[in-house]
A protein has these predicted regions:
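Bacterial Sec-dependent N-terminal signal peptides
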Residues: 1-21
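Extracellular/periplasmic carbohydrate-active domains that bind, remodel
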Residues: 18-449
Length: 449
């Protein structure tokens, strides 16, 4: 090994090893600079605009009128009282609006795809394109919120669910457009391509609050935070068990607080993303960064995931004081492949309690993909104070590339009561273990007889 390179590695590793304690001051700095939205005093009750919470009447016109009135008054609060409000089509936000669902209120969207046309600019699995409108869509807005104790139902378990088996052509076309740098204005899919819309998408927005609502039955991802910043998501709950029902997907997102959320999802609870392949790498100036996840209850496929669409990079993620309240396949899961490029770095996870999982902690550069030549850089990942009752497959997995190893991984105070496989580490360097127990703890050696 080149001596100067060895010295650099030694200094780099020593620096990380000395500073891998959970950086609470950095967390506080992120949380303190996130701005909550502020709204004018204007309020409008949708009942005054002809809405009926009878589960039958189409209330699309009344909700559109409410948004228009808020825009005319430079913002305000739209009040949705108790009742079931059917809406045949999307809600499109304007700036400075709080959509407040009172206790007992439910918005129930139609499941007719043509209700979500004309197409809007959106993103689908990391590729920008035109597609069906998300059910709730905010584009280039500021100071916006969805609050209250009501429910949003995406009616995703019927027509939208059937799209999953038909999406192959549209999915491959979107990826080809990404890889071939087709201008976004020419990426028009929508009707006939079977790409399901997100339930809620904030796109190029800032100063966002989602608080205390319940999300059910999404067609696709539930809450997509796309190219947005200064975001607070707290106190919400889920029961959304359809295909690809991720709970929260920050993508190219900055300064995000996710706290006190109770998940029950058909896919990842939180999946941090940053664009896919060529398009993501071209946006490397806007990685997903400064994301705090704390005091959450996990249930679904995976607890916290980074990737696999993360080509612009993900950095400065802080996860603490979370636990499972039901099944998870994997607890913490970092995944990428040789298509992606980009980086995953400065990830700190502490005080996590898991029950039974398939894999407890999993870092892989070998997630399935279509190409090669763009290995991701995974470094500076710290896990501390993690407990798990049972891992039916593996306790800890670390998988890098032969020519770009995963590096600087700290595992401290890890207690996995039972695991079929304890630790599997391939193409990794500078892995520090301190107080790591998998299975029964060894005792002092017995004397020879």
């Amino acid at each position: 090994m080149n001596f100067k390179y060895f010295i650099f590695l030694l200094i780099s590793w020593t620096s990380f090893a000395q500073n891998n304690e959970f950086p609470s001051a950095k967390v506080d700095s992120i949380v303190n600079r996130i701005q909550l939205p502020v709204f004018p005093s204007y309020q409008i009750n949708v009942l005054k605009l002809g809405a009926k919470g009878d589960s039958i009447t189409n209330n699309k016109v009344a909700f559109d009128k409410a948004m228009a009135l808020c825009k005319k008054n430079n913002g305000g609060t739209i009040i949705v009282p108790k009742g079931i409000y059917k809406i045949n089509g999307p809600i499109h936000f304007v700036s400075n609006v709080n959509l407040k669902l009172e206790k007992g209120a439910k918005i129930k969207f139609s499941d007719k795809p043509k209700d979500y046309l004309p197409m809007v600019l959106t993103s689908w699995e990391g590729t920008m394109l035109y597609n069906y409108s998300p059910l709730i869509y905010a584009y280039e807005c500021s100071n916006i919120a969805i609050t209250g104790e009501g429910t949003i139902d995406g009616e995703g378990g019927k027509t939208w669910k059937s799209f999953k088996a038909k999406e192959g052509q549209g999915k491959e076309l979107s990826r080809d457009m990404n890889h071939n740098n087709v201008p976004v204005k020419d990426r028009k899919l929508g009707d006939g391509y079977f790409l399901r819309p997100q339930m809620i998408q904030f796109f190029n927005c800032r100063n966002i609050l989602v608080e205390n609502i319940r999300i059910e039955n999404s067609p696709f991802w539930c809450l997509h935070l796309l190219k947005s910043q200064s975001i607070t998501v707290r106190g919400i709950s889920y029961k959304s068990l359809n295909y690809n029902n991720d709970g929260i997907d920050p993508e190219y997102a900055k300064d995000v607080l996710i706290e006190n959320v109770t998940f029950n999802n058909g896919d990842d609870n939180v999946a941090i993303k940053a664009g896919r392949d060529h398009e993501g790498r071209a946006n490397s100036a806007t990685p997903s960064e400064n994301i705090v996840i704390r005091n959450c209850n996990f249930k679904g496929l995976h607890g916290v995931v980074i990737g696999s669409e993360m080509s612009a990079g993900v950095q400065n993620v802080y996860v603490e004081n979370c636990k499972t309240v039901g099944f998870l396949k994997r607890g913490i899961y970092l995944k990428t492949n040789a298509d992606r490029g980009g980086f995953i770095r400065n990830i700190f996870v502490r005080n996590i309690t898991l029950d039974e999982v398939e894999d407890c902690l999993y870092i892989t550069a070998n997630y399935h993909g279509e190409g090669k030549g763009f290995q991701s850089d995974i470094s500076n990942v710290s896990f501390s104070n993690i407990t798990c009752n049972k891992a039916t497959a593996s306790g800890i997995v670390i998988q890098g590339f032969a020519d770009k190893k995963v590096r600087n991984i700290s595992l401290s105070n890890i207690d996995i009561k039972s695991a079929k496989n304890a630790i599997s580490s391939t193409n990794a360097e500078n892995v520090l273990l301190n107080e790591v127990f998998i299975g029964e703890k060894a005792t002092v050696p017995t004397a020879a007889k």
